[in-house]
Amino acid sequence: MSDMKKVTLVLSDGTKFHGKSFGYDAPVAGEVVFNTAMMGYPESLTDPSYAGQLMTLTFPLVGNYGVPPFTFEENGLPTFMESDKIYASAIIVNDYSEQYSHWNAVESLADWLKREKVPGITGIDTRELTKVLREHGVMMGKILFDDEPDNIPEANYEGVNFVDQVSCKEIIRYNEGAGKKVVLVDCGVKANIIRCLINRGVEVIRVPWNYDYTDTDFDGLFLANGPGDPDMCEDAVNIIRKQISQSRKPICGICMGNQLLSKAAGATIYKLKYGHRSHNQPVRMVGTNNCYITSQNHGYAVDAKTLGNDWEELFVNMNDGSNEGIRHKVNPWFSSQFHPEACSGPVDTEFMFDKFVETLK
């Protein structure tokens, strides 16, 4: 620990937290957010939804099970990660464990961060930082090295189309010839979403976020997760509107997909004070007493009161009452704000994939 450089996290309101660098030694700026999950840092770091963000982990000890190998399955999906690289701009922890032990680990978290050129800081009171963000809302911040001048520009999060940065640039097919065809709109899709569809025997046609698929031959539409503000994705929303105006084909959405489908249904989106990023968010299925523990990662939410008359809420968050999913009253169109594929987190709601695939038949 003695050879780690001293760094300071400076929030946009001037609040400072002092720590040490254990990742790539470079200053960085971004939106500071917090995640209260106890595990899953390899999956979270490679989740494209964290693009542009400095990810704070509230669990005090991080790194003690190392990092799994970057291997790929026959279908081209990463075996243990959620994409092919780290998307978070930095990771902020309280106590980084230099020693790691796990049957599947091949390197330390520090070595992985350095190889991918991603900063990491330790020694921060992450729970105090979380209290600040919870009280004042998420804010922009910088990680600066104490012996270097502040010479990096301020970062922007609002008004940036992160989806365009992380989406695929060409069509990718999985499980070709398997049967029913699903067009998956890639806003920053996690690998396990594709895996959950493949495992249910469908062919997945992964298309860029602004690709017009309305004249394509397919059986169902899947709207994937992704980073940033859904209001930056008007092209995707307009294509969804076009699709639902001309076809009753099944539609399912997750996270950003819930927001884009809601916008196509006439709803407005607002930014949450500090977002939902954890493995233990309770949601209730509307019209039932069924409550599920879910994995979540989003900073924006749907204003359910603004949904069109043909739509209704499907899930509601039990902590703050915010929307967690919508459905059409007649057609097989539904979505969830949470992540039924988890990875990491609970798999209580994986039945959402079953329901979607059943509607394809």
Segments the model singles out, each with a brief description of its role:
Residues 216-221:
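Short acidic/histidine-rich motifs immediately flanking catalytic phosphotransfer sites
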Residues 225-304, 345-355, 359:
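Cysteine-nucleophile active-site neighborhood
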Residues 325-361:
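A glycine-centered loop/beta-turn motif at secondary-structure junctions
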